[in-house]
């Protein structure tokens, strides 16, 4: 689990095949290696990846073909700089929100507006994903925990403070760029519970009417 608070900006140095459909993603980094162990989880632009090698200058991760297909890592036009966050430890403060590191979709940046020292960034997203986004709710953009300032059926806006804009790769984004999006997991749990509630209404099980209809 992650919190969406970025620790460091790294740079992708290579993606290479390890054989048997396994890929290795190597990121140049300086600080996240502190207390790192093989097998640790790190969110790389919001994607949970497993550490398979590291030294003082870089970290390598295992990358499945499916992850390559469903993320922007294989996009040559995508930024080579990435947000990095180590997995949350027991007892850490939850400064952002619960981020799993499972990307739901891509969103496209359509507008950036500077208002004083703050920034408003507008994105378009598939309506099937937008239904999980709520006003003033949380969303992870490239792994960054952000708050929804406005939304419609296929669009949302985030308001970004200067520190977040400067200390993450948000400042690198240009209109037309795509980003990884992970919606708040709580919305998906609510949807799942409601689905079961509807099933129970359609099939209520043993009721007084059921017993009467069966001669009891």
Please name every model-derived segment:
Residues 1-216:
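Conserved loop->alpha-helix
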């Amino acid at each position: 689990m992650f919190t969406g608070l970025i620790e460091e900006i790294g740079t992708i140095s290579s993606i290479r095949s390890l054989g048997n459909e396994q890929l290795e993603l190597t990121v140049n980094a300086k600080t996240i290696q502190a207390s790192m162990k093989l097998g640790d989880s790190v969110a790389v632009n919001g994607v949970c990846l497993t550490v398979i090698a590291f030294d003082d200058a870089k970290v390598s991760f295992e990358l499945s073909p499916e992850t390559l297909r469903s993320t922007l890592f294989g996009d040559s036009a995508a930024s080579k700089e990435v947000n990095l966050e180590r997995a949350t430890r027991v007892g850490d403060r939850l400064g952002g929100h619960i981020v799993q590191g499972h990307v739901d979709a891509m969103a496209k940046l359509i507008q950036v507006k500077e208002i004083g020292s703050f920034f408003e960034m507008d994105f378009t997203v598939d309506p099937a994903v937008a239904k999980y986004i709520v006003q003033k709710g949380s969303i992870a953009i490239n792994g960054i925990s952000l708050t929804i300032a406005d939304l419609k059926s296929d669009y949302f806006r985030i308001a970004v403070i200067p520190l977040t804009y400067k200390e993450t790769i948000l400042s690198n984004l240009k209109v037309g760029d795509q980003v990884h999006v992970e919606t708040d997991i709580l919305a998906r749990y609510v949807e799942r519970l409601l689905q079961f509630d509807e099933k129970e209404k359609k099939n209520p099980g043993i009721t007084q009417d059921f017993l009467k209809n069966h001669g009891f």
